[in-house]
Amino acid sequence: MNQLLNKLSPYSHILPRIVLATTFLVHGYPKLTNTDPITAMGIPMYVIGLFEVGGAILLLIGIIKDWATRIGALLISVIMVGAIALVHIKDGWQGNEWQLLILAVCLMYATKGNSINKGS
């Protein structure tokens, strides 16, 4: 069993990356294509959508390019900090656990890049 898991280890960062990228593509695209001048906490929705979609695309490109992983994760981290501070903080822990989890995963990708499985 350990042998199989050791063989799969170099690829373990791909599934969470795909799930994270898909989530932000699905949530960001409608904001990006909305032509109404809607704002969330004073920020135009298309700007939020640009960060979400751009971050997601960069995370996917990041499967083969380390720099894209780091930049994509940082873009999504900015969105998550804003979501926590401006929208979800009023709900306490019950309203922030998912946002904090996404932020933690993004910070891991931002700091480790594609060296997640290399022990560096």
Region roles according to the model:
Residues I38-A40:
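Surface-exposed loop/turn positions within long extracellular repeat scaffolds
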Residues M1-T33, P44-L50, G54-I57, I61-S120:
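Extended, low-polarity transmembrane helix blocks
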